[in-house]
Amino acid sequence: MHNNENVSGISAYLLGLIIGDGGLYKLKYKGNRSEYRVVITQKSENLIKQHIAPLMQFLIDELNVKSKIQIVKGDTRYELRVSSKKLYYYFANMLERIRLFNMREQIAFIKGLYVAEGDKTLKRLRIWNKNKALLEIVSRWLNNLGVRNTIHLDDHRHGVYVLNISLRDRIKFVHTILSSHLNPLPPERAGGYT
């Protein structure tokens, strides 16, 4: 990981988005060809184009990645793609060392995961994911920040776990995670918190 705090924070934030609403894909083609692809999907064109793409471009420039960002419109979602072996392994290696993230990286990752998988209603603050072990890591980080939470299997979503922020600690979550100066959320994704 680079020493630059902006690079590590933005990288952790983007990794949260990738894990929540995207993926790291190694695609195999005929003729023994392969493609390494980093993907983030979102319903909001504005979020992809005005917020996520500039952050990804910053990281691409910092890492001297030669690949270009592609934004593909699907039926219901927009997909940001970068075909790059270097960027693929950069994020894959980050994911392997997630337990070693410093506090800044933890906050940035949680913020990205929340933008991707979080419930933005005023009644509850929740993050969904199929990977219970990942949510347990996030839960520990939040507990260390003084934000109480619980994890359980969501009965309405088969095989998906939900991390619930305690009612008492919603404001602390908003101030600690969502209002951090790193990568401020666009108003449309802040659930009324800006």
From Swiss-Prot:
Q: How does activity depend on temperature?
A: Not extremely thermostable, has lost significant activity after 90 minues at 65 degreees Celsius, has no activity after 4 hours.
Gene Ontology MF: a single term: endonuclease activity
| Naturally occurring in which organism (per UniProt) | Desulfurococcus mucosus (Desulfurococcus mobilis)
Name of the protein: Homing endonuclease I-DmoI
Q: Which InterPro entries match?
A: Homing_endonucl, INTEIN, Intein_endonuc_central, LAGLIDADG_dom
Q: Which GO terms describe its biological process?
A: intein-mediated protein splicing; intron homing
User: Might you give the EC number(s) for this enzyme?
Assistant: 3.1.-.-
Class of the enzyme per the UniProt entry, highest EC level:
hydrolase
Query: Which keywords label this protein?
Result: Endonuclease, Hydrolase, Intron homing, Magnesium, Nuclease
Keyword S-adenosyl-L-methionine found: no
Q: Which domain of life is it from?
A: Archaea
